[in-house]
Amino acid sequence: MATDWLGSIVSINCGESLGVYQGRVSAVDQVSQTISLTRPFHNGVKCLVPEVTFRAGDITELKILEIPGPGDSRQCGDLQQADTGIPGVGCQVGPSQNGTGKMLKKPFSSSAPQNIPRRTDMKNQDIIISPQQQCSKSYMDRHMETLSQSKGFRRRHNSWSSSSRHPNQVTPKKSGLKNGQMKSKDDECFGDDIDEIPDTDFDFEGNLALFDKAAVFEEIETYERRSGTRSRGTPNEKPARYRHDENILESEPIVYRRIVVPQNANKEFCTDSGLVVPSVSYELHKKLLSVAEKHGLTLERRLEMTGVCASQMALSLLGGPNRLNPKNVHQRPTVALLCGPHVKGAQGISCGRHLSNHDVHVILFLPNFVKMLESITNELNLFSSTQGQQVSSVKDLPDTPVDLVINCLDCHENAFLRDQPWYKAVVDWANQNRAPVLSIDPPISEMEQGIDAKWSLALGLPLPLGERAGRVYLCDIGIPQKVFQEVGINYHSPFGCKFVIPLHST
């Protein structure tokens, strides 16, 4: 009796923990009380193993989905422990319709097996089934029945709203030649029954490997070349139309060395964009400023331009808009400005005036001298009109660290100032304050007791500064291009859209 069920397609429910398995019966062992399925599916997903074996104790419900062989006579009923080794397991069959369209149910004894009629006979007679355990139709019949029901649901879907509101009204059927033609077209497209369901999945990778994409693309390209048309995705071809931000003309090669000095530079720098900026000697730089002054770039203009560029750099070093905004008025940055009695000191005073105008607390140190330069006197008169503080003694400088120290103590002409007591005291204070130092136009020579700067700002063209100058920046003080040419420098501005740019050592 157990061998009669071999080849049947069944569905085994093993409870919530193990789930539902479907497959074809390959073996039924009455001794060990097991049943085996080949090509199993677990909860609708194909299993990786070719065969699965179940014990009778794990099975909650067993349903027969399809009995093999349309001409074979199979028996279906309660599979008793003596026959199949699986006690209390039945099979289900979908309801068969008789002449009245109703399903007849009749309980039967679980001790006696019951014959299952042939498929041809099942269509014309009612099946006597158990009220709790039912034998289902074949898998193909149930699938076709589902398709027919779904078709009927689609046809009735459009009249759902009217029928639900007026249940007694019947929607009139549309008639006419046009509707009949449409119905026949629908039947031609959707009315065919499914003859067979393929058992194997479609091999996408294998069929994709058969497609020679290179040959197809070559054929398309050859056809388009002959017909004169061009595809948008064809490589190595320029588009016929350009976007609004594209240049039609080919750009010339980039020249990175645009500044040429008459003598070999001891040191070269480069900008962020890669432009080479050579350094110049102190004598050439002094000559450049002298010629510019003859052309109208006076000392007052140069001091003003230097003060603006240096203050812009200092403001960015202090934090820029993140530090200097109305929400931080209680945290004004403090800058200590150390100036000597020379032109470079006047440049620092001009920078301090602009910083004070931008709500920065500036403490200006300038030693007392009997006679001052006119440029220093003029800058001090302007600085005194601001809220900045001027001191002449190191004792008046703050004991706590400041936000920034601006160094304008050194120059090339007055080297003897380094031996003065006030100079040494100021240098010691700056080194002990532990604040970052910005040097404006520092000299070339290394000083024994100088202040190590973190940043240095050069004017026009940089000098060959040493390592103690820190990171070098370059500012534009407005020297015309013809002035550079007059001193023998082939010059092209490296600043772009900025007045202060960083330089990198090459």
Curated annotation (Swiss-Prot):
Residues 99-118, 149-188 are annotated as: Disordered. GO terms for cellular component: P-body. It is found in: Cytoplasm, P-body. Residues 1-79 are annotated as: Required for P-body targeting and interaction with DCP1A. Residues 190-226 form the DFDF domain. Residues 1-68 form the Sm domain. Residues 189-294 are annotated as: Required for interaction with DDX6. It comes from the Eukaryota. One of its GO terms (molecular function) is mRNA binding. Keywords: Cytoplasm, RNA-binding. Gene3D superfamilies: 2.30.30.100, YjeF N-terminal domain (3.40.50.10260). One of its GO terms (biological process) is P-body assembly. Its main location: cytoplasm. SUPFAM superfamilies: YjeF N-terminal domain-like. Residues 281-485 form the YjeF N-terminal domain. Binds single-stranded RNA. Involved in the process of mRNA degradation and in the positive regulation of mRNA decapping. The DFDF domain is unstructured by itself. It assumes a helical fold upon interaction with other proteins. Belongs to the EDC3 family. This is Enhancer of mRNA-decapping protein 3. It comes from Gallus gallus (Chicken). The gene is EDC3.
